Structures are given as C-alpha cells and as structure tokens.
Amino acid sequence: MAGDPSEYFMEALGHVLITMVSMSPCTAQAKDMPEFKGEALNVRIEYSGKHSGELGLIMERPLASLIAARILGLENGNDVFDDMIDDAMRELINVVCGHFLTLMYGYTPVFKISIPEVFRINGAACTMLLSNPNICTFIVDGFPLLGQVRIR
C-alpha cells in the first residue's frame, strides 16, 4: 500500500463517474462548495480482509436523481423513484469501491465487500461535515458532492 487513500478515492470516483454517467467531478475547497439546500443521501460501503475500511458518498437528491437516471438509461431525473435512486447509489459506491481497492492495494488481495447502505441526512449535517479534514469535496454539474475514506 502506497499513497494517500483520498487521492486514490478521488481517482476512482472520477473514473467511475466519467465512464458510468459521463459526468466529471471537479475537486473544490470546502469554502468554495455550493450550499447543501435540503436532504441529502449518504451511501456507505465497507470492505474487510487483509485491509479494512469504509467509503462514503453524500449528495443531494437532485444530483442522485440525475446520476440514477443516467445509470438506468432514462431521459431525466424526474422519471426516477426513490427506490431506483437508492439502488443506483448502491451500484455507484460498489463500483467506486472496487476501483478504489484495486488502485490502493493492487490486484492480488481478496476483500469481503458489504452490501451498501443508503441513509438520509439533512443539509445542516452536510455543512458541518465540510470542516472535517477527512472529507473530499467535489462539485458535479453544479451540485455539491462529499466523499469519505476511512481506513481501519
């Protein structure tokens, strides 16, 4: 294992968003992030084996709807129901996790990957997270997106 986990996470997220949904995340300083205006989705996944940790993504529903629509091949995010969004977010974090693990640890280690979970959190909690130094901050199509890597 060499390198900064956050750098590998940013690389994995960028690659996955570009290839899966044709979106490019732009890294941003916390002070430059757009405000979270409402409820957000927090999707998390854990991995264990020789190494263990957790990855997470937090985004508002409009961005999650847009990503879900693109994953599902729909015209726009208005046609996507909550359960479809949750499933798409689980798939997104699962693919990001797989790419992250390969970048971080190589092709040899075998990991057990948890079933991703989706939680709702309010915008105020998202704003508080911006001060956490372990949070990666991105802007995707004008929307805020937070990422987190926790190595155990």
Where are these regions (language model features)?
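N-terminal auxiliary interaction/assembly segments of multi-subunit proteins
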Residues: 1-152
